[in-house]
Amino acid sequence: MIPRRVVLLHGFTQGGGIWIPVMEAMTTRAPVDAPDLPGHGSASSQTTNLIDTSDELALRFGNSAWVGYSMGGRFALHVATRHPDAVSHLVLCSTTAGIEHDDERAARRAADHQLARHIRDVGVGPFISEWTSQPMFAGLKRTPLDLEVRAENTAEGLASSLETCGAGEQSPLWELLPTLRMPVLVVAGARDEKFCRIGERMAALIGSNAEFVVAEGAGHAVPFERPQAFADLVSDFLR
């Protein structure tokens, strides 16, 4: 069944415009939207949390195929678990159902808040350079589009995103994965061992309606390291 609409949800420090190469390469006949998530781009002044944002997204776009990368995947998963009637298909790329153990989640929350203070101290430009220099983004080219989209963010917006929507703020959704009934595609880059393990486990818990795919030659940022390959994966899945 062809979805009525496709919604693409970006990762931390990005914005909806980062999806342009993927959108141009997709062959689906459905209209495609790529909104800015809270704290990013045109939504830099928004400080909505994960739950409220997922409710707003479901209301805004209605029944759609949802494609989420990293942070965007956590938003997409919230939409799917809270509003399953709004999700015809679900693609989760390089993402997680949350941090399960309370002490680990508390430690991550503290680290996220410390990082938020650092962002406010150093400013958006230096922080984005630091962020994208992490080994997990080694395969990501700093294209003019990538630089332009990230430059539309603000230090306060990114800091507030961590404080309201960071992984440390999210309640784990692992126990809800078996309740998902829509077709689900879980994707991770072959060089991203951590999210390969997480993705494989997520797909196993979802069940027979889920497929786990490893993107060869890619790291964490699969859609932006290999936009054509990712677009082909998603387009084939939505047919």
At which residue positions do the language-model features occur?
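The conserved beta1-alpha1 loop
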Residues: 7-11, 188
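Active-site glycine-rich loops that stabilize anionic/oxyanionic intermediates
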Residues: 11-14, 70
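Serine-hydrolase catalytic-loop signature spanning alpha/beta hydrolases and amidase-signature enzymes
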Residues: 13-21
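Active-site loop/oxyanion-hole signature of alpha/beta-hydrolase fold enzymes
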Residues: 20-24, 33-67, 232
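Gly/Ala-rich beta-loop-alpha elbow adjacent to hydrolase catalytic centers
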Residues: 68-72, 76
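Flexible "cap/lid" loop of the alpha/beta hydrolase fold
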Residues: 81-82, 86-119
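Conserved serine/cysteine hydrolase catalytic core
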Residues: 153-204
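Catalytic histidine-centered segment of alpha/beta-hydrolase-like enzymes
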Residues: 218-227, 231
